[in-house]
Amino acid sequence: SVGFKAGVKDYKLTYYTPDNQTKDTDILAAFRVTPQPGVPPEEAGAAVAAESSTGTWTTVWTDGLTSLDRYKGRCYHIEPVAGEENQFIAYVAYPLDLFEEGSVTNMFTSIVGNVFGFKALRALRLEDLRIPNAYVKTFQGPPHGIQVERDKLNKYGRPLLGCTIKPKLGLSAKNYGRAVYECLRGGLDFTKDDENVNSQPFMRWRDRFLFCAEALYKAQAETGEIKGHYLNATAGTCEEMIKRAVFARELGVPIVMHDYITGGFTANTSLAHYCRDNGLLLHIHRAMHAVIDRQKNHGMHFRVLAKALRLSGGDHIHSGTVVGKLEGEREITLGFVDLLRDDFVEKDRSRGIYFTQDWVSLPGVLPVASGGIHVWHMPALTEIFGDDSVLQFGGGTLGHPWGNAPGAVANRVALEACVQARNEGRDLASEGNQIIREASKWSPELAAACEVWKE
């Protein structure tokens, strides 16, 4: 017959291929699908595969001008979620040719761009992505990575310490720089701009950059250690963001910062390239992540956003604490912490890792634990996160009854005590409080901190 068969047909006839072998070059996705009542899971899974690749709602004449078999996404496996009725994990494979090289933006536009408002689905959540080696290799990744950062800072064998300067809005640049200096002088490695400190009427970015640079040079001279302050370069336009990064480089500071979700992946990748070319470290804040990842059955899991960041580029990223004020289940958090740091991560469903991921030597990202943590948490944090991490105590430094510098001293003493105890073979989980108590005998600053935050 001439022409083609017009009309609407079930997605599952074309896009559900349970016997399909996935290719090493495919991007694999695991979706948590909650179909509308009466919609079979195969149809729901196939609908996701279709709408995020080559499909549209009806057969079109131009389908005949391309090879659907070559380009279509395929739903290749569906399994029910234990303990949930009418919830399924649908696995979808996308041919690599559907994606632009080196563009996290395009990857997300394709995979999660359109399908989340789909009528046949009550809810949809992207749980994990397997990025194939061939695609990983089209990204620069983190500007420097864990090892290069340690070499630049000359700090080895322990987690790094940070502190977010509070109150986050309202300080003048001069007083802001003063707070930075006190913290760094006391023994922290880094201080941090809050995510919403950009360039507001009470403190313009240039003034802040200048006073913070002065503070860290002064602290460096006093302590003989390299210091950094995450200068937030996030701005309303990409051009302005790069302008701020250029100014930071001209001041000779070691690190800048970006809010990668509100700033966008395109801006973030540009900044990451600039940072590698100019020797700046890049600290990443995940402001707005909970809008996307908080719901258990809809949106995107943070591990996907973390993987995307490693491709786009960043040297540090906030990743929850496991112990402080923000929620995070321990095993799941450790799962994506490994995805950020390690070169090769095995599939492990108990840790939320749906696919084995090989990063083919893309540099690692340091996870940043931050939010409601203080000196009593130090043993647990040292044990959970290990050496390759940044521990950030905002209120846990600035809330010290004697001020910022003593607060910084308390944190540094607690950290060094925990690292030493661990290296001597002591068990941080069971002896943690004991270790902190012993250390506080020799440090009045730590003793005062222990008193304020005792549980």
Swiss-Prot record:
Q: Which portions of this protein are annotated as coiled-coil regions?
A: none
Does Transport appear among the keywords? no
What are this entry's molecular-function GO terms?
magnesium ion binding; monooxygenase activity; ribulose-bisphosphate carboxylase activity
Give the cofactor binding note.
Answer: Binds 1 Mg(2+) ion per subunit.
A cellular-component GO term for this protein: chloroplast
Which InterPro entries does the record match to this protein? RuBisCO, RuBisCo_large_chain_AS, RuBisCO_lsu_C, RuBisCO_lsu_C_sf, RuBisCO_lsu_fd_N, RuBisCO_lsu_N_sf, RuBisCO_lsuI
Specify whether Lipid biosynthesis is a keyword of the entry. no
Query: Residue positions of the PTM N6-carboxylysine?
Result: 192
Which locations, inside or outside the cell, does it occupy?
Plastid, Chloroplast
Catalysed reaction(s) here are: 2 (2R)-3-phosphoglycerate + 2 H(+) = D-ribulose 1,5-bisphosphate + CO2 + H2O; D-ribulose 1,5-bisphosphate + O2 = 2-phosphoglycolate + (2R)-3-phosphoglycerate + 2 H(+)
Give me the residues that bind Mg(2+), please: 192, 194-195
Q: Which CDD domains match?
A: RuBisCO_large_I (cd08212)
Q: What is its EC number?
A: 4.1.1.39
Tell me how the protein is altered or processed after translation. The disulfide bond which can form in the large chain dimeric partners within the hexadecamer appears to be associated with oxidative stress and protein turnover.
**Additional info?**
The basic functional RuBisCO is composed of a large chain homodimer in a 'head-to-tail' conformation. In form I RuBisCO this homodimer is arranged in a barrel-like tetramer with the small subunits forming a tetrameric 'cap' on each end of the 'barrel'.
Task: State the protein's purpose.
Answer: RuBisCO catalyzes two reactions: the carboxylation of D-ribulose 1,5-bisphosphate, the primary event in carbon dioxide fixation, as well as the oxidative fragmentation of the pentose substrate in the photorespiration process. Both reactions occur simultaneously and in competition at the same active site.
NCBIfam families in the cross-refs: PRK04208.1 (NF003252)
What is the protein's given name?
Ribulose bisphosphate carboxylase large chain
Organism for this UniProt entry: Lupinus microcarpus
